[in-house]
Amino acid sequence: MSGGYDLNLFASPPDCKFLCSVCHGVLKRPTRLPCSHIFCKKCIFRWLARQNTCPCCRKEVTRRKMVEVNKLRKTIGRLQVKCKNAAAGCLDTHPLAHRKEHQDSCPFELMACPNEGCTVQVLRGVLDEHRQHCQQNGQQRCPLGCGSTLAALEGEHHNCYRELRDAWVQRHERNRTLLLGLLGRVRRVHLTTSIIHQQLAQLSNFLEDDDNLLLNAQVQETEVTPEAEMRGTQGQSVL
């Protein structure tokens, strides 16, 4: 990868004194060696990683004596460059030093739609128009972090405090409804348990009464049997 600026970036061909002898691009962060030859900082460090001599004169290089040439860097920064979006229609030219500033505002810069769920990329100049048509499908999170999902144009009227308060009220009511439902179930279970206890008590009483009746019947039967036997014996004696 080249360490310098691509020649095609510039509005007019740069002077050869601004070119790097290693990458043949325009010098980026120009760095001068002790022998006075100047290269892109990245280019010369890559070169010196393989051999410790100047690419031009082959003199040995002492790294601690290498210096960045800030004056030359500023001169190169004033060279006029074309917008990187020239192919998309931008005809603007500006100093190299202002390249990023222009790029951040260029109407021909390709931008991703910020609406959540939308994957369309449009030019910055028509992004607002796209968002107006995209708002029914595209949504975005509240930038203040309340967690609300907003339609594209709702942000101006969005109130985080109100949204959070309403969400809290809804959650509180939902929890209250759940609690009342659980309490109702507990009451029904308690009532059912009480009825079962009553029925078990009644059944126990019935069983106890049956046991008493059975016991009394057995006692009476025991008392009657000896008397009958005695009467039978006496009758046989008389005969």
From Swiss-Prot:
One of its GO terms (molecular function) is zinc ion binding. Keywords: Cytoplasm, Differentiation, Metal-binding, Nucleus, Spermatogenesis, Zinc, Zinc-finger. InterPro entries: Znf_RING, Znf_RING/FYVE/PHD, Znf_RING_CS, Znf_SIAH, Znf_TRAF. A zinc finger (TRAF-type) spans 101-156. Expressed in testis. Expressed in round spermatids of the stages VII-VIII semniniferous tubules. Expressed in elongating spermatids of stages VIII-IX seminiferous tubules (at protein level). GO terms for biological process: cell differentiation; spermatogenesis. It is found in: Cytoplasm; Nucleus. Pfam families: zf-C3HC4_2. Disruption phenotype: Male mutants fecundity is normal. A zinc finger (RING-type) spans 20-58. Signal peptide: none annotated. PROSITE patterns: ZF_RING_1, ZF_RING_2, ZF_SIAH, ZF_TRAF. One of its GO terms (cellular component) is nucleus. Its main location: cytoplasm. May be involved in acrosome formation of spermatids. Interacts with DTNBP1. This is RING finger protein 151. It comes from Mus musculus (Mouse). The gene is Rnf151.
